[in-house]
């Protein structure tokens, strides 16, 4: 064993016997096992595609619900756009409510809603991957569609409550206290909204209390992302504006959405690790820890697609002689997953 490996194994032994670093490494390892980067990228893409239809739909619905109250309509819309640093101003100038007859508006609104539902499907898929739900146990199209509509309802309610709370804090306080109070209220509301959304997206058999730890962390992080997102995006676009011109706005939006997606996936991974006690994980294998075997078994059983299909997983010590069993790398004598 070379000195580098000796040092790494010493670090591995240390983290496995310390709860906090073991949990952190467990979350990071599970993020990798579940291909969390790919899930975050999918959420970013579908979130980007759904953004304009959702804003058009929001503006149109507000036009009906708050008819005769243009000030309140703009307040809610501006509150939604304020969550998008830098590009919020450009969106505000270009997003307008649909116009036309009642039937045309209804058809247009339904079309926008259907176009935006992709993000809800991806979020449900991400939660199923994080909790390693076998394919055979995942809901069909119509239950997923109903969950998607419920998610939009929860988000709309959160937006209205957030706008009302921000208005109350702004009217009751002024200056720096108003800013600090607004951030605290935003963190609390984001935590509650995150918990409500996770409850909608996560399989029913997962208890609500298991969803709370990740939301307690994600809520304030979303507030930080909203409050200081402009600085992050400005850093990202320092040179992109001259090179890409208008597309720099798209780059800024994608960067912001990807950070939000990563917070979401990491929060869900933290919930799964804490609820299922998926730590300590090994940094160097072999040997595998009990948590390693539990995660790898869950990932393998996740591939069950039919009720007639049953996946079993077994583990052995050390490497296989010759890298395979008697019948070759995929033969029946292979002692790996069956």
Language model segments and positions:
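Membrane-embedded alpha-helices and immediately adjacent juxtamembrane helical segments
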Residues: 1-338
């Amino acid at each position: 064993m070379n000195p580098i490996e000796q040092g790494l194994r010493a670090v591995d032994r240390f983290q496995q016997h310390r709860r906090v670093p073991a949990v952190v490494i467990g979350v990071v390892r599970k993020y990798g096992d579940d291909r969390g980067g790919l899930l975050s990228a999918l959420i970013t893409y579908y979130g980007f595609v759904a953004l304009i239809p959702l804003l058009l739909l929001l503006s149109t619905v507000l036009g009906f619900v708050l008819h005769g109250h243009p000030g309140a309509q703009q307040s809610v819309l501006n509150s939604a756009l304020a969550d998008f640093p830098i590009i919020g101003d450009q969106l505000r100038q270009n997003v307008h409510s649909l116009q036309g007859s009642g039937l045309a508006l209804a058809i247009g609104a339904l079309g926008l809603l259907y176009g935006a539902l992709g993000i809800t499907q991806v979020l449900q898929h991400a939660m199923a991957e994080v909790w390693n739900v076998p394919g055979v146990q995942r809901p069909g199209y119509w239950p997923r569609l109903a969950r998607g509509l419920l998610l939009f309802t929860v988000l709309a309610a959160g937006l209205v409550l957030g706008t009302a709370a921000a208005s109350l804090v702004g009217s009751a306080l002024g200056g720096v206290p108003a800013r600090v109070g607004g951030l605290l209220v935003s963190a609390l509301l984001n935590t509650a909204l995150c918990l409500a959304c996770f409850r909608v997206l996560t399989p029913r058999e997962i208890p609500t209390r298991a969803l709370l730890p990740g939301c307690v962390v994600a809520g304030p992080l979303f507030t930080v992302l909203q409050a200081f997102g402009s600085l992050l995006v400005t850093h990202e676009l320092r040179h992109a504006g001259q090179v890409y011109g208008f597309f720099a706005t798209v780059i800024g939006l994608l960067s912001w959405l990807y950070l939000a997606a990563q917070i979401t996936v990491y929060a869900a991974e933290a919930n799964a690790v804490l609820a299922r006690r998926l730590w300590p994980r090994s940094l160097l294998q072999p040997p595998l820890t009990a948590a390693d075997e539990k995660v790898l078994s869950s990932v393998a059983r996740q591939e069950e697609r039919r009720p007639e299909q049953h996946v079993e997983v077994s583990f052995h010590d050390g490497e296989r002689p010759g890298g395979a069993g008697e019948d070759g790398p995929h033969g029946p004598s292979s002692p790996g997953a069956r």
